[in-house]
A protein has these predicted regions:
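Conserved GNAT-fold acetyl-CoA-binding loop/helix
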Residues: 7-33
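Conserved acetyl-CoA-binding loop-helix of GNAT-fold acetyltransferases
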Residues: 78, 84-97, 120-124
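Short, small-residue-biased leader/transition segments that mark boundaries at the very start
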Residues: 1-3
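A short helix-loop-beta-strand connector motif used in the catalytic cores of GNAT acetyltransferases and
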Residues: 32-45, 72
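A conserved beta-turn-beta hairpin within the catalytic core of GNAT-like acetyltransferases
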Residues: 51, 62-73, 83, 102-105, ...
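C-terminal "cap" of GNAT-fold acetyltransferases
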Residues: 105-159
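Conserved beta-strand in the GNAT
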Residues: 45, 51-60
């Protein structure tokens, strides 16, 4: 797997989502988090004779309701010129094989609301919208503020 391709696909996805200005990661961070001593995130790549055409970036989750580990697919991206060739399906198949091999129960992901072609692909493969649930995110200052409150309450980060 080419590290540079993984980073380039992350940047291409951000550009596609009209969010290039929000990418904070660097090639060095991709190397450390995906290929360092203790990776916690993985990338499955699909290539053809023209090179790497797509990527599914994922990490392990846990479902208390299922009592099982699972996969959260953080990013799925196929280069525009390679769409319609079944590459997204191949990436999903690879993740399904990993899940089946490990006995994991569930795969989850999010999709931007205006990306109807992706929504159509996900539904075609058996994905379901989770009615009544919203995704939330916390980045930066709110995290720091909560950590400071925790320190003031005598908490530590020890696991």
């Amino acid at each position: 797997m080419c590290i540079r391709d993984s980073y380039d696909l992350v940047c291409n996805l951000a550009e596609f989502q009209k969010a290039s200005d929000r990418v904070r990661t660097s090639l060095e961070q991709i190397v450390e988090t995906m290929f360092g001593d203790n990776p916690q995130v993985w990338a499955e790549l699909v290539e053809d004779e023209d090179g790497v055409q797509g990527m599914a970036l994922w990490f392990v989750t846990y479902s208390t309701w299922e009592g099982s580990y699972g996969i959260h697919m953080e990013d799925l991206f196929v280069r525009p010129e390679a769409r319609g060739k079944g590459y997204a399906s191949l990436l999903f198949q690879r993740l399904a094989l990993i899940m089946e091999e490990k006995g994991w129960a569930r795969m989850e992901w999010t999709v931007i609301d205006w990306n109807q072609p992706a929504i159509d692909v996900y539904q075609h493969m058996g994905g379901e919208e989770i009615e009544g649930w919203y995704d939330y995110r916390m980045i930066g200052e709110p995290v720091h503020a909560l950590a400071e409150q925790g320190r003031q309450n005598g908490l530590t980060a020890e696991l």
